[in-house]
């Protein structure tokens, strides 16, 4: 049953302060999951307030270094690491991520031992980092467990990682904070073993960007990462993180305009991203999709063969197609082949369930036209 939205008789900042105090009251160990972005910076200062109120000493902070992070962001995180009120754990673990170039996908291992031997790491691992060797692993393959399993090590009792997730950033993040009636902002990490007593807390889920920047600058007189100022000057994307996956790499020119030297190094390590930089503005996505969809299921197979460049991706794609095909047989209008191709080459399909074509898309218009043609043909 749907519930009507209720408004609080307090500001979003005061509400977040109540939530974060509740987190400290509820859990034995509380850590701030820090990325260098403005949202996690706001979380850091909210936690600082609680630590000063209660005399808890330095704030425990976790930073997951993903190697391809902007140099400006890395410098800011290192500056925060040296604050006397911060106790930071800096993790550099080998995790598989995606490199997407004009519809073609391949897995890339962060902090790869092979790329290190080839001199193709974007930068060297900092000497203070916690790395695979600390867990008896190597950098030649991805860590076997979810990363939260490793960052959780050494924490006592029930543990909460506080994150800067905000609901208005995406529908996925919105859904993550509306699934529970009580303590809706406290959730379990995705796919983490239930035996591990770790939860995520998202106390600023109802903030907007203006709330974040005002809180940092006016209430604490603090600074945020310089990257946001650089991005604002060039009209670039306001996001810190890896720029290689299927969504962020479409704004590669924004990252390049903000930090051209960083792109030079990215090009040295992954020369094929230059094709994305040069050709994306003229890339005809619809023709690319229609070319595969017109061949039916043979076109789907060709799409996988030509665009999934690593064996693991091919296996995941084939499983996704098998599930989609079952639904296509039952309802071909809601599950057209063009929508399947679009998900394979443009969207994030790994770890997601197959879904029908959604509104506000070109495939949705095709669906409506197909339904109308069927209705007219059947005389209804």
Feature roles, as predicted:
Residues 1-33, 38-380:
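Nucleotide-activated chemistry modules centered on ATP-dependent adenylation/adenylyltransferase
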